[in-house]
Amino acid sequence: MTPHEYLSQLLASQEMRDPDLRVIRSLRDELAAFLGRQLGSGPRIYYGGSYGKHTMIREAYDLDLVVYFPPTDARSLAEIFGAVHQALVRGKYVVEPQTVALRLPYEAGFHVDVVPGRALESDFLYATLYKNSNPPSTLKTSLKVHIDAVRKTELRQIVRLLKLWRLRHGIPLKTFALEILAARALAGRRPDDYGTAMWKIFQYMAKEMATVRLQDPANTNNVLDLTVQERSSVAQAAAKSLSAQTWGEILW
């Protein structure tokens, strides 16, 4: 069996089951309907994250919902963030505020991240998010650009493999960073052979992770803040994978 065949089998084993997808869609519909009643018809609600990018793996997934208010909404971003937070609390949801999201925890570690923002234009392509940090700030980005960055570069399956690799090796790195690393390592090459593509990514991580600057493809002014520990963990795991004798030691 070739590395590509082995990795293809792993990907097949991580496909989402129809019952799980139905639960996710039902939950999205429930939240969208609730927020529509609470917030009115102005905001648009989109799938974000792994569902929007089609990069879910069965063993570890969650749901991102983006709530973009129209550019005509005169409230501050802090007020918009607060309005969505208050609406969820009124609905008896358990809410854990994150940096740009309102996290709703469910069973078995599953959660929904609700991300409020305000669109910059009427096309809703770009939006500004509120950063719930100290001090508070804002972040301009684009969900649609992030989705296209994965879909149009055909990185979907590679990202799924990297998410499984992260899970197996306990690597503390967000999926968004993995997506950018994959795109940077492959530099426009089509990932037709999964083994070759993953090997190139591991080589790039092992060599460049200590100093690489990861920029948001939707806004190069947004640079991902990676800790020394995160950089070191990724580089060490990549080097370990490169020294493995079989793919079964790297991904299973």
Tell where the protein language model's regions lie, with residue ranges:
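Catalytic metal-binding acidic patch
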Residues: 54-77, 81-84
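Conserved catalytic core of two-metal-ion nucleotidyltransferases
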Residues: 59, 81-123
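A structural motif
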Residues: 115, 121-162
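Generic non-transmembrane alpha-helical segments
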Residues: 30-41, 83-91, 161, 165, ...
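N-terminal regions immediately upstream of nucleotidyltransferase
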Residues: 1-46, 50-58, 73-76
